[in-house]
Amino acid sequence: MASTSIGPKDRWPNNYGFEYYYGFLGGETSQWEPRLTENFDAVEPPRDDPSYHLTVDMTDKALAWLDDYRAFDPAKPFFMYYAPGGVHGPHHVFPAWADKYKGKFDDGWDAYRQRVYERQLAMGVIPPGTELTPRDPSMASWDSIPEDQRPFQERLMELYAGFEIGRASCRE
């Protein structure tokens, strides 16, 4: 495949086995004005929509793909690689998205991790008897974070939670 101004397309997702690709190929992508690719074509995000956000756009596309896939054969297994850019720098998030999680992480990531584990067990996402894995030893325990640094860490968790992962992962 010939090289283009945006690189050799033989290394793009569609040539690595993905039937459909929508997203960005470069790092540190703007969530407001991204450079997008759909399969092998460059596509433009809407320029006149002040509510546009790449993470919403990617989630909409992922869910539409899932609906189409399930309509074709609901029993057929699938693999969707959903990797929104919003959870990586630069963190472009609408304040209202993050603010709705204000205070939800004030007890820290260890407590949150335990809650998620218990919720996954209750929902049947993980089988009964599954043990919570030990915290990564390179990750500090919440108790070891100095009090004056905790508000910053709490805000980072609020920002991260403000993205669309819940809408994508809770789709039935």
Predicted features along the sequence, with ranges:
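Formylglycine-dependent
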Residues: 2-102, 107, 137-162
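Alpha-helical "lid/cap" subdomains adjacent to substrate-binding clefts that gate access
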Residues: 105-135
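Conserved small/polar residues in nucleotide/adenosyl-binding loops
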Residues: 168-172
